[in-house]
Amino acid sequence: QATDSVRQVYAYLQAVGKTDSVIFGQQNNTSHKAGSSDLSCSDTMDVVGSYTGIIGLDGLSLVGNEYSADRYLSEMQGLDDVYETVAARINQASTQIEKNVIAAAALTNYNIRNGAIATLSLHMPNFSTVSETGNDTGVSYAGYNFSGYTPNLLTGDVMNQILPGGAYNEAFRAYLDMVADYAHQVDGAVLFRPFHENTGSWFWWGAAFCDEQTYKSVYKYTVEYLRDEKNVHNFLYVYGPGSEAASVEEYASRYPGDGYVDMVGFDMYHRNPQQGDSFVTNFTKELQIVDDFAQAHGKLVAVTETGTAHDVAEGDNQTALLKSENTRPDWHQEILDAVKGSNASYYLVWANFGEKDGFYTPYVKSVKEDGAKHGHEMMDPFIRFFNQNNSIFAVNQKD
């Protein structure tokens, strides 16, 4: 029952995977930036004149943590062609969370209209901490407070308790109702990546907190609920564990099954990069394992998250790329070169949350009167990367 847009995106990603071209993606590419707030809504737009070819949002943008109706109303006027229509719908919605879901879907539609492919991850709250709001006037998800950041709160046996009969099943279903409402408002396909990095143990859905069967059961339940009960037919389901698997067999251990997954991937970050380190070698090995698995199962494949991760620098809350003296200025090109020979269609780096909050692409700090851009030291290598014939950005995909 997949929509035409899903079939088109699937065929496109499959085709790109067979070439030596690679789509460059970024989380929150049009809603968070490290560069000047006087320029566009996107650091890559400032640096190279395009949004990224894949743009990720998270459930945190649906619940008001990373994006909100207020932000849409204040930032998208004059930018989004359908602003007036969206603003009217936001103003008519009765609860704040419904307004936020409308805004997140509108941002996604803006990204799609500008040539990007959408993906949605879920940093879900720990459902043992979710409180009821007492609001029973409208949609189920208005009855719960899903805000805050608790995916790394590891108590509560949450994976078992969100299944039918469990203590948190009703709250989990309400959360999925919110995801479904978002899906129904998106005009196009969404690569939906729930319960990611499940082979590590830093989220409550991680390997230490549920057995293989429970993980598979929760993943299948999620797909069946959205697809069969909520009639969501514009999702492509992405299984995106960490990079722990040392073999195809190990990669398969928590895989939910071919009937529940359209794309497989992995998340792998380059920690404290140095010239001559083994990251690209290890990354290529992991990509080969995932690619082999994908070919055996007839699935799409991608690098679902990557980026550089440095020890937190003085004055920073989080450090991804360094502000200066990065040892691998051509990092984005290095990853493109590692991915291009595989069947992977894209790689996605994480969000530019701010200069002190972690950024994964260079950015512009100011533009001089003569048009000269001043900013992060990796701008020139990134412009070269953008200009490669085989790097794909949104501008290359726009109809």
Where are these regions (language model features)?
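Substrate-binding cleft of secreted/luminal carbohydrate-active enzymes
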Residues: 18-29, 36, 299-399
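Aromatic- and acid-rich polysaccharide-binding/catalytic face
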Residues: 55-57, 251-280, 350
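Boundary/entry segment of secreted carbohydrate-active catalytic domains
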Residues: 1-61
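Structural preference for beta-strand elements that scaffold enzyme active sites
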Residues: 21-23, 54-56, 115-121, 189-193, ...
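Substrate-binding cleft of extracellular glycoside hydrolase catalytic domains
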Residues: 67, 72-228, 232
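Aromatic-lined carbohydrate-recognition surfaces of secreted/lumenal glycan-active proteins
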Residues: 26-27, 193-196, 219-249, 298-311, ...
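Alpha-helical scaffolding within the catalytic cores
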Residues: 8, 35-44, 103-105, 243-255, ...
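Substrate-binding cleft/loops of secretory-pathway carbohydrate-active enzymes
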Residues: 39-42, 239-267, 314-323
